[in-house]
Amino acid sequence: IRICDPAVGSGAFPVGMMNEIIRTRNALTNYLKTKKGRTIYDFKRHAIQNSLYGVDIDLGAVEIAKLRLWLSLIVDEEDIKQIKPLPNLDYKIVQGNSLSSVEQNLFNQPLFTKLEELKPAFFNETNASKKREYKKQIDELIRLITNNNQSFDFKIYFSEVFHKKNGFDVVIGNPPWGGDLSEKEKAYFREKFQSAKGIIDTYALFTERAIALLSKGGI
């Protein structure tokens, strides 16, 4: 299952969804012959790597959301010696404007393939120099795919989700509302969003974007 909060804030909704995933998977453990790889820690790390995504325009909120996920990994671990190095969440919880989009290079599938190979390696890498090298390569691939456009785009930063299911299974969150928009922003939203009519409210824009992010049958 792939879950996204496009206005992630401090990460309350993704952490809540992670706990639901863990509760469900843990309930099934008693019915399985092997318990290997089915600790609470294993479930949490797997959910963070494979199920949870978030975006926020506020860098401070993004860092708090990352910290919240990191803390959730170690909070139940009684033996500090058993705690593994924390994963790298830079391409899981991302700073960006969820209402933006980017024109893509039409001939970029090989770039996406490489990007989707590097991100799991970056997530799990503990060596500082290797992390820097992976991040450098990932950022360069994103630059090439976007033709140097630095705006955020879900289909680029979370491309693995859209290549497998063409969207998320679940989009959650509390859409921001009542934000002050410049005339330039209003013109952009009127061009890109059907809900941008009359007095434009970011709540409606986020709701429209959330629906567009869903895979077929998503909620």
Describe the function of each predicted region.
Residues I1-I219:
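SAM-dependent methyltransferase catalytic region
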